[in-house]
Amino acid sequence: MNPKPSGRAGDAEAGVRLAAPGDLDPAGAGMRLLEREEELQRIAAAIASARAGTGAVVALEGSAGIGKTRLLWAAMERAAESDVAVISARGGQMETEFAFGVARQLFEPVLAAAETGEREVLLEGAAAPAALLLGGGRADRLGEPVGGGDRSFATLHGLYGMTSKLAARAPLLIVVDDAHWADVPSLRFLGYLARRVHGLPMLLLVAVRPEDPGAHGLLLTELVAGPEVDVVRPGPFTLDAVRTLVQDAFAPASLDPRFVRGCWTTTGGNPFLLMQLIGALRVRGVQPTSDAVEQIGEVGLTTVSRWINLRLAALPPSATALAEAVAVLGDGADAVQAAGLAGLDADSCDVAVDGLVSMSILRGADGLAFVHPLVRSAIYAELAPRRRARAHREAARLLWHAGAAAEGVASHLLAAAPAGDGEVVEILLDAARSATRKGAPDLAVRYLRRALAEPAHDTSRPELLRELGTAEQNAGQFAAAAEDLRRALECTDDIAAKIEIAFRLRTALVWSDRAHEVAPALGGLIAEAAKRDSEGALLLEAAVAGALQVDLSTPRRLRGRVRQVVGPAFAGEPVPPHISSLAAVEALFANEPAARVLRLAEEAARGSYQAPEFARAPMRAQLFVALIFAEGHSLARRLLDDEVEDARQHGSAAQFLNAAVLRSMLFYRLGTLAEAEADARAALEAAHLHLGTGPSGAGPPAASLHAPMAVAVLLDTLIERGNIEDAERVLTESGLAHTDSPLLLFTFLIGARARLRAAQGRTPEAIDELLALGARIEGALLTPALVPWRSQAALALAGEDADEARRLACEELELARVFGAPRTLGVALHAAALTGPVNERVGLLREAVAVLEDSPARLEHARALVELGAALRRQGQRSEARTALERGMDGAWSCGATALAQRAREELRASGSRPRRLALSGVDALTGAERRVADLAAQGLTNRQIAQALVVSVPTVETHLRHVFRKLDITSRKQLAEHLGSEQPAEP
């Protein structure tokens, strides 16, 4: 390929025009809207919902030519009449390889039309991460993301922030036509947005073809199939509608019924085909009489391609050449480039354009565009495969010479055959890096795989494999990443580069449930690094040791390798932070005193940013685990808050997923159930959107380290709320009801699954799960801090095997006393009290209450108080029992633990007290936190403003509002004031 001319901006999109926003002028726009009353009513109702602040999502689903675009046009007209702002975009077959192409169509015109100051405001705050994609704002201040430059989650979060800002200015209609041709990152954004429209002055309106889902049908299916989506399916015209349109077109004195029926049966009532048939008949001078019925068949409009061929046959060959060029370049093609691709001079091009417009093949508008996507598809399909590939390579050459961005050129190179051109490799590599920076690793993977096929020169192959493996990892394709990173390692000579590749390989193997392969994969490199880079060798030893830690099936002889690596830290010697974090986890697993675990974790935290960037993610994950379970709550909360915010501002989905799921566990252990639920749901959504898992975590093992933990936290919060049926549904939908793995974070899922079975009365299943878990982790995980399987099993066994229950509870209590952390000890004391001798019960429960009194673990404190009150009541100490029960009920209610609060209320009634009824619906059912959020929302504050006022996260506010709406049985924020009135929140 010719080199790119100097003086051209590298990111200019000269000659590459995304379908113009708002340019949704449908073929037959002047046609009357017939038999669409119901569709228009549903769209009007959705617009009214947006104006009322309720929010709505509508999907127009139907075959090509059925009139979806015409309905979108009508919706935009109605919105404009209702003072609703409109932004629009259209997917295109040649635009599926543009990172966030549809999203950019939506927002770039808004920013282009804004004054400089207004543009800065639009791209501030939550929208700031979108600045790199959309331009303007403070993109230069965003910093670099962690781990390979992937900004996928940050970009998504920024686009949502931008959308929220626009909706805050005025009710907003977002229109996306041909969403089945939207690029994958934009589809992710639309799905992300659809789940958040509720309660916002916004309508998301998309048009899709169910039979043409593109290469990303799952994302599209989920966008349309969501519970919040109203799917509108316009049908074909009836015979009556066809009669009306034929009458309008021909205005005859009389209309022959057989002619009308012939038009109807030939087109199947498809509006687009019908209008094209009518146009073709009129060009021939046909009148709608019985004599003309046979001519309908002669026109032969049974397929679009046949109709196009008939029209092109009436034009000079130059018109066909130009039509084919536009089909290759895509809608919105520049006339000069289309002429170049067609081999036409300017005058011949003008003549060809005029002819194509006159035959209703091209639209008469800026840029060259077909009257309907069906037309482009038909012309493109007529090109023989080899000719098509050559045309795309020539299109790439023309665009590159014109200064187009690498991504625009790469979309054509993907459709061109490899030819051993080194310049092509450079363009594709440039495009991949651009896609990664914008948060579209999926596209980067496609570009890089194509670059490898060119084929690449030997000198560029290591770099391509390294970048491909990193992109695959960012896209959640961990198995593929592992294989490509292995290949990169084999053909790389530089030791520093090899160490970085090895770290990425380690992550890919662990995340694809193959942690046991890490040690053999990195063994040879460690020996090599020991001779050439001693610090690098230590990093690699820590990487292998960390993988051995998270795989609980690691043989005892290999676990000794971990002890060898962390030995200097245990001896008190100065060590790098990645060794301190590893040592903290090793001490935690071995049930060494929590104070020692925290000391090592705090040392790691102080130097956590001294490690190389590629080594930080596993090190910080170890740090967070040590802090959470050794109960260094304050530092854990601060660091995790920073990590979540960093991911939102300029991080990847993997970074957010890791931080959110660990913070959800922290929140659950603290008893802040709404926050725990919010983070767990956000983590599952991130796993689903970016890493290919199912709605609640099901799917390939892309998120095997984190989705099970998020499901575990979600199960636990629902159990505490008494929502057992919801918990079972979450578990079933996750696909993890029977899944097992030796990886560490699966132990949390097994524990939560057992708690659910016990709550359902399926005690034998709970016991089997817990005892099997205990047998598996024996020797690898001694501490009860992570998963207290012994106390859980003891409580389940108490009614069947009291001796075994007591043995397990005593064993856990002994371990917990050594560990010394309040929550861990309180949980063990609670189990020992309920399974031990009755005469020791009150004493053990008093100790549990005392241990937890000053701990931030509010839920466990409330649980201990309720059990103490119940035990005191049974001993006849009613006054003291009531005090404990009332405190326990208050604590449980403030946590949102409805089931425990209800239990406390029942015990109070049994003690002779008359506690206030715990309402399950209505204003009295709101917890204090829910009422505070509801009051601020009723005052008109946005979710972000509420979050700032209450110092909580936006997802937490969303979770509270979801509970408020359910309890009050409302659908709009505007209904809050009338339901809340002047009443005060009910506290038991």
Name each model feature, range by range.
Residues 867, 906-909, 915-988:
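Helix-turn-helix DNA-binding segment
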Residues 80-82, 282, 347-348, 441, ...:
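Internal alpha-solenoid helical repeat scaffolds
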Residues 4, 154, 198-262, 266, ...:
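Alpha-helical sensor/transducer elements of the RecA-like P-loop NTPase core
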Residues 5, 15-23, 101-173, 221, ...:
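Conserved Walker-type P-loop NTP-binding/catalytic site
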Residues 1-48, 129-146, 244, 301-304, ...:
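Conserved adenine-nucleotide phosphate-binding loops and their immediately adjacent elements
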Residues 57, 71-75, 79, 351-352, ...:
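Extended alpha-helical scaffolding segments used for macromolecular assembly and cargo binding
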